[in-house]
């Protein structure tokens, strides 16, 4: 019930912000609007789409610029499914990846070291909103028209809906970081983990002592920032191929934390399909997970991990090892679509591992 009310509240806030922003901008610009030529409707629609895409780019560029100004290092820049990232040897590459549910873009950076329980997070988190507002005003002032007014309106709406704390937006991240040291440490750690992943390494595997440090954290109230820490433990055991332990941790997350944010929830659910198929192929949980519309949509994405999940399901649940091997081969051909270098390494290891299990089973039956 609280989830439904929260969703309604967020919708009302966005609607209210849009109305108020439009009303204020229209009043401020009314003298100029009177003298402007009436716009073409189709061009307005096209301008709205282009403006939305441009503001996502501008928003992420704001994070990038303010991050660089405060000592961060570039990791990746994504707009929808297009990603620019830096891998080993500072190699920059452009590629397509699966987008993150609930986000239009994302700029990830490696932060400066944490000192005295904090680090420069304010400008980095505020950079996107700041750039949206600045560019909205500049474009309108430089070339006033119905189209640039629309551009400005979309920018202001995007800025406000990111600034007002809700869901897992910039405003909420800022609010949580300002609340306490635990949240600041957790978000700092998540940024470090992402940086290591682009370098083909796991931070938690490189520094396993961090798991004990996480257990000592006094987390009074869970949120999406602290929830990330649970995935670090899962990553550690996944890297070690302790799959029963991974399965247990995923089940715990699934049943005890139903309010996980959507991207996290989808990751838990699709991973559970793979491991439950492996260990409990007759479990009703598998059908429950596969019936979820978000999971269904995600499994259609051309990702190596999806191929491994579907291969295990085909092998253990559908009892079709030959088809499973064919699916694994499909996954091997798209390893370049893994979200980062560490994921690519893990995806390849798991494709080989599952393939060896299936091949061994086939040979035993001959």
What do the predicted segments below correspond to?
Residues 264-276, 304-312, 340-364:
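TPR/TPR-like alpha-solenoid helical repeat scaffolds
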Residues 229-236, 272, 310-311:
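Structural register within alpha-helical repeat arrays
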Residues 205-218, 243-257, 280-297, 320-334, ...:
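Alpha-helical repeat scaffolds
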Residues 46-112:
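Small-residue-rich helix-interface/hinge motifs
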């Amino acid at each position: 019930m609280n989830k439904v009310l929260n969703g309604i509240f967020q919708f009302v806030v966005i609607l209210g912000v849009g109305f108020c922003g439009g009303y204020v901008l229209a009043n401020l610009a009314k003298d100029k609007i009177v003298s402007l030529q009436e716009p073409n409707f189709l061009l307005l629609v096209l301008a709205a789409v282009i403006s939305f895409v441009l503001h996502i780019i501008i928003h992420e560029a704001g994070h990038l610029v303010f991050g660089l100004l405060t000592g961060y290092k570039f990791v990746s820049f994504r707009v929808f499914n297009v990603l620019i990232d830096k891998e080993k040897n500072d190699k920059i590459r452009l590629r397509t990846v699966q987008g993150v549910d609930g986000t239009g873009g994302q700029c990830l950076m490696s932060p400066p070291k944490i000192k005295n329980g904090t680090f420069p997070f304010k400008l980095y988190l505020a950079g996107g909103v700041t750039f949206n507002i600045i560019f909205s005003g500049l474009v309108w002032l430089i070339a006033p028209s119905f189209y640039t007014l629309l551009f400005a309106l979309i920018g202001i709406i995007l800025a406000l809906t990111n600034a007002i704390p809700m869901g897992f937006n910039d405003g909420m991240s800022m609010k949580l970081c300002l609340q306490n040291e635990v949240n600041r440490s957790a978000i700092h750690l998540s940024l470090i983990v992402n940086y290591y992943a682009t370098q083909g390494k796991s931070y938690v595997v490189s520094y396993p002592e961090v798991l004990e440090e996480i257990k000592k954290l006094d987390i009074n109230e869970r949120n999406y920032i602290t929830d990330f820490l649970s995935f670090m433990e899962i990553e550690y055991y996944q890297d070690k191929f302790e799959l029963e332990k991974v399965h247990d941790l995923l089940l715990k997350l699934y049943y005890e934390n139903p309010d996980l944010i959507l991207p996290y929830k989808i990751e838990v659910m699709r991973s559970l399909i793979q491991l439950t198929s492996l260990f409990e192929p007759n479990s009703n949980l598998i059908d429950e997970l596969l019936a979820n519309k978000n999971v269904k949509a995600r499994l259609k994405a051309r990702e190596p991990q999806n191929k491994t999940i579907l291969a295990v399901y085909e092998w253990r649940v559908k009892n079709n090892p030959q088809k499973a091997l064919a699916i694994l081969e499909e996954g091997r051909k798209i390893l370049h679509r893994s979200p980062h270098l560490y994921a690519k390494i893990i995806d390849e290891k798991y494709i080989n591992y599952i393939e060896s299990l299936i091949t061994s089973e086939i040979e035993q039956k001959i």
